[in-house]
Amino acid sequence: MSVALSFSGYRHRKRLVRSAVDWFVSNFLGKYQLEIDIEDRGLNREGLYGACTVLDKNSRPREFLIEMNNTLDDVAYLSTLFHELIHVKQRVLGEFKTKYDKDYWFGKLIDPDTEYKNLPWEVEAHQLECGIMELYLDELNV
């Protein structure tokens, strides 16, 4: 496992983020060399808890920006962080791809008119985020 992590935000959150990202990458993306920048900032105006953006290339991406809403409490923050890390996993493993501005989920073209909440990568991330957070907290004995 190799992840280069940069973080802008509060010291307490930096420790939380480092631990969670290291755990997630070692459990789900161990063989990949990744660069993940995490920006902790106010996203209330945008109406977001978090966002994940590919920074390098859409084919075999390895560099990501995760923006996190710094007004969330620690539980919501951690859940959102795992949600965004699930998107990193989806991109790295090729489950969710974008080719020529068209989105594919496991090789199937996704209708561009699909509502956000029904996009398959969002459905999966919402389904998994709390369970992954519970696994993480159990391993920490929190």
Each model region followed by its residue ranges:
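Hydrophobic or amphipathic, alpha-helical segments that drive membrane association/targeting
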Residues: 1-12, 34-47
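Post-HEXXH active-site segment of zinc metalloproteases
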Residues: 75, 91-123
